[in-house]
Amino acid sequence: MKQEIDPKNTSRAQAFELWMKSPMPMVTLTKTFDVTRLRMVSRRREIKFNILLCWCIGKAASQIEEFYLLPECGKLYKYDRLAINVIVNNRTGGISSCDISYTDNLDKSCSNYMALTQSVSTSCQNSFVEDAMVIGTSAMTVTELDSIVNQYTDQFCNPMVMWGRYRKGWLRTTLPKRQ
């Protein structure tokens, strides 16, 4: 559920004030992540790497109060649940957007991910969750990108993270490649 709140009564009061006056309120950070253990868990539990990575992003975000807040049209809204957005290759060769409600239950999250992404891929219809704070993600696995910079628009003001193909070394796996 989405509820308007007074930004002055939150830990984000100053950030909200600065955000509302900024022409492009965005900071882009890039970092190499060692995902060796995540890849090992993925293989051991036979869970697709991107499903597990999206679940970990949701798990981390669910423990941070600020991830439930979203500035929109000059107001601040608080959501009571999260969703993860993924980009899906569809059957026509294009891409579609798919929001997946976050749950702490990894098995349920995996089955929801598989069912929803398969449905979106087949139907070529975007699937959006309107009553949840959506964290944008994308696995651009056909590229070897190191960073994606998102241009702010008032249509997409939610947090976003994107990654390319993971890089396997002899003893380590990283996102993206270390220079």
Name what the model sees in each region.
Residues 140-164:
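Glycine-rich active-site loop/lid that clamps phosphate-bearing ligands
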Residues 26-28, 81-85, 134, 160:
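Broad gene-expression machinery/nucleic-acid interaction feature
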Residues 39-63, 161, 165, 171-179:
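Acyl activation and transfer enzymes in specialized metabolism, enriched
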Residues 1-47:
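N-terminal beta-alpha "docking/capping" segments at the starts of catalytic domains
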Residues 15-16, 72-76, 150, 163-168:
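Catalytic micro-motifs at enzyme active sites that drive phosphoryl/nucleotidyl and oxygen chemistry
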Residues 64-71, 122-127:
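Short secondary-structure capping/junction motifs at helix and strand boundaries
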Residues 90-147:
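Helical lid/core segments from catalytic subdomains that handle acyl or acyl-like groups
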